[in-house]
A protein has these predicted regions:
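Short acidic (Asp/Glu) patches
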Residues: 57-69, 83-106
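Structural motif
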Residues: 77-79, 108-109
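A short, Trp-centered hydrophobic/proline-enriched beta-strand micro-motif
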Residues: 42, 79-82
Length: 114
């Protein structure tokens, strides 16, 4: 039985806000260049009770937005990113993670693998 590729996640939690440009760049390369994860990408930057969420249903390795965020992404205490390898259906924004829900006046963001 061979190894099956799955989606990949990157998360960072820090006491102080930091930039994740280098880590985002490394993950983005796996999103269609060094890896098969070409079916979408997303990143969430948290700031207190708010979240800044970006997603695209296209390869992260080819995204001008990813390149921009690698240099200009906001420093954050908490970052969650995901690159998608579709196992069902075509790439679509509604299937691109992280997902966001607002409950009780607070943004909740999640991503999963499988």
């Amino acid at each position: 039985m061979g190894v099956r590729a799955v989606c990949e996640l990157f998360a960072m939690s820090s006491r102080y806000p930091i930039s994740v440009g280098f880590s985002l760049e490394t993950l983005a390369r796996r999103g269609g260049h060094n890896g098969p994860h070409k079916d979408g990408w997303g990143v969430a930057y948290f700031e207190e009770r708010d979240v800044f969420l970006l997603r695209e249903p296209s390869p992260a390795a080819e995204s001008d937005l990813v390149r921009f965020m690698e240099v200009n992404g906001p420093p954050s205490n908490l970052v969650l990113s995901h690159i998608r390898l579709a196992t069902q259906g075509e790439p679509a924004l509604c299937k691109t993670q992280p997902f966001q829900r607002d409950l009780g006046g607070q943004a909740h963001v999640f991503a999963h693998n499988g």
